[in-house]
Amino acid sequence: MAENSESLGTVPEHERILQEIESTDTACVGPTLRSVYDDQPNAHKKFMEKLDACIRNHDKEIEKMCNFHHQGFVDAITELLKVRTDAEKLKVQVTDTNRRFQDAGKEVIVHTEDIIRCRIQQRNITTVVEKLQLCLPVLEMYSKLKEQMSAKRYYSALKTMEQLENVYFPWVSQYRFCQLMIENLPKLREDIKEISMSDLKDFLESIRKHSDKIGETAMKQAQHQKTFSVSLQKQNKMKFGKNMYINRDRIPEERNETVLKHSLEEEDENEEEILTVQDLVDFSPVYRCLHIYSVLGDEETFENYYRKQRKKQARLVLQPQSNMHETVDGYRRYFTQIVGFFVVEDHILHVTQGLVTRAYTDELWNMALSKIIAVLRAHSSYCTDPDLVLELKNLTVIFADTLQGYGFPVNRLFDLLFEIRDQYNETLLKKWAGVFRDIFEEDNYSPIPVVNEEEYKIVISKFPFQDPDLEKQSFPKKFPMSQSVPHIYIQVKEFIYASLKFSESLHRSSTEIDDMLRKSTNLLLTRTLSSCLLNLIRKPHIGLTELVQIIINTTHLEQACKYLEDFITNITNISQETVHTTRLYGLSTFKDARHAAEGEIYTKLNQKIDEFVQLADYDWTMSEPDGRASGYLMDLINFLRSIFQVFTHLPGKVAQTACMSACQHLSTSLMQMLLDSELKQISMGAVQQFNLDVIQCELFASSEPVPGFQGDTLQLAFIDLRQLLDLFMVWDWSTYLADYGQPASKYLRVNPNTALTLLEKMKDTSKKNNIFAQFRKNDRDKQKLIETVVKQLRSLVNGMSQHM
């Protein structure tokens, strides 16, 4: 029962499998058959049985079908056999037709192949044309690039390269020639860089050579503009009725207008002739090189190279020649090169972007300015010619004004000019020292004579002299001063003008200029003129008459100082009442010179007295005096009288001092003559003769050779001699010794040492002519008295030395 139930269950399954096999593609039968074996054991046998049964069913169906269609098949075969004969005939016909068709189509095939070949060629040509149309623009651009390179149009060439790389090469990048072009472009760029850099180097060398011409042109232009402005200012001043002074002479207004008109016309002509920096230098290499490096993306390299090279050139330009200080052309060449350098840099700054910056030019200018100041300070110190220093100042002002017009700060240059101004004044002082020396050498040191009104006015026009008494005198007459006074006055004014020349164009106020003029004039008076006067006074050949005239001259020069102050005031238009106005020190200068001259008068006078005294020829052993004064002394007194008459033109105090000094010196000289250590013995006759000479000196003193002495003041110069001689002449030793040291002593001025020295010279020791020889014969008691006096005098001398 169980087996039957299992068999019943497998039958539907086997039918399903068979249906699946019949309806499924043979490729998928494998899994279906595998399921037969995966089922129950012996299931495949049952399946085989079922399969055999199914096959038998199908065979039966086929057999039924064949039996049904068999007659039709037989009929079809019969029909087919009948058609077979016709088919063979048709085959023969078709074969013949085919042969004939093949024979006929051989030419067509040949022509067709030709057509195909032509079509292929046509297609290839079309393709080539299309490719060539792509390549031709590239080749044309590359050819254009070559032409631009040949024509040195490098910036355009670089632009063409950019177009080739960005537009044209992508179209034909697959072709070999394009790769060659692409590989060649970097080399062309490097060539362009090298060529443009070479052009830049040539440009830098060119502007280095032309810097002086560029600077000269720029400085001329600045000078013309300044002159034009000054001319306009003068013209405007004339319109307002202001008086114009050119140099020292006042020029009428009509002449001024003519001069200014001519000046303006000349300025217009000069401006037309002036070239600009663009006219002198071709800047295209710089622009071209800058654009090229900008296109190449290497602008920073170009800027660094340009700035580095220009700094090197700046150092070369700023290096002066060793002999630059010898001529103004050396300074001019130095300035023009520097101006040319910075004019080029300023032009580059304004026409390019980034190549030169304001910070860079300022740094370069500050470096250059420090070097320029150091160079000018060093080289100007070698200048000894004031004209050269003045030309250097004018050049420096034009140099500063030129660069200031281009925006460079130049205040330090004007500060330097103030330093150079001190040096300029020093050179002026040295020059005027020579001028003053020449004036003093040429002066005859005698009053200026004038014989008519014309000569009188000429002197008055040169020197501000006012004397109503002299004006009233009839011709011929004489000015009290000598010829050097108006010459000195004129030269002082010339010095002021020369000093003013340097102060012009320094952008300083009138007050500062006035102060500078007064200070420089003070230096001229207190140092140069004073030194020249002192040297003149001390010269050996200057005599007493000349010294007297020098004192008179200094008096008039001192009085003229106020006119010099007015002269400076008229130039600067600064009132003397201004608080900070410097006063001229001429008063003290001429006072010092006058005092020196007075002292030299005293010295010269004493020297002259010494010369007369040296002529003294006393016979110190004479027994009796000659009865008259010595000849040398009378000559001396006559000389002193004539000299003191000349002193009447001097101030009274000077003449009195000179007279007193002369008498004191004469008294001292006579005293020294008596006490001379080489004089061993003196006779009483010699003393009496000497007394006669002293009496003449006292008579001269009492005759009042110079007015103004009170009483016997001048005679007191000989009081020492008088008391000494009276003591020996009267032989009043008892009174001298008794009253010694008393204020009311008759011989108060006689020094014991002096008396002892003279007494010993008169004492007879061993010589037969001794004055005391007769005493030993006639009166030995008196001899003892003398010995006693000598001992007492020595005692007084020793007492004095102990107190000292």
UniProtKB/Swiss-Prot annotation:
Write out the GO biological process terms: exocytosis; Golgi to plasma membrane transport; intracellular protein transport; membrane fission; mitotic cytokinesis; vesicle docking involved in exocytosis; vesicle tethering involved in exocytosis
Task: Give the location in the cell.
Answer: Cytoplasm; Cytoplasm, Perinuclear region; Cell projection, Growth cone; Midbody, Midbody ring
Which Gene3D superfamilies does the record match to this protein?
A: Dsl1p vesicle tethering complex, Tip20p subunit, domain D (1.20.58.670), Exocyst complex subunit Sec15 C-terminal domain, N-terminal subdomain (1.10.357.30)
Keywords of this entry: Cell projection, Cytoplasm, Exocytosis, Protein transport, Transport
Tell me any Pfam family this protein matches.
EXOC6_Sec15_N
Q: Which domain of life is it from?
A: Eukaryota
Q: Where is this protein primarily located?
A: cytoplasm
**InterPro entries for this protein:** EXOC6/Sec15, EXOC6/Sec15_C, EXOC6/Sec15_C_dom1, EXOC6_Sec15_N, EXOC6PINT-1/Sec15/Tip20_C_dom2
Listed as disulfide-bonded, the cysteine pairs are: none
Cellular-component GO terms for this entry: cytosol; exocyst; Flemming body; growth cone; perinuclear region of cytoplasm; plasma membrane
Protein's job: Component of the exocyst complex involved in the docking of exocytic vesicles with fusion sites on the plasma membrane. Together with RAB11A, RAB3IP, RAB8A, PARD3, PRKCI, ANXA2, CDC42 and DNMBP promotes transcytosis of PODXL to the apical membrane initiation sites (AMIS), apical surface formation and lumenogenesis.
Quote the subunit structure annotation. Answer: The exocyst complex is composed of EXOC1, EXOC2, EXOC3, EXOC4, EXOC5, EXOC6, EXOC7 and EXOC8. Interacts with CNTRL. Interacts with RAB11A in a GTP-dependent manner.
Protein family per UniProt: Belongs to the SEC15 family.
**Know the name of this protein?**
Exocyst complex component 6
Can you name the source organism? Answer: Homo sapiens (Human)
Which lineage?
Eukaryota, Metazoa, Chordata, Craniata, Vertebrata
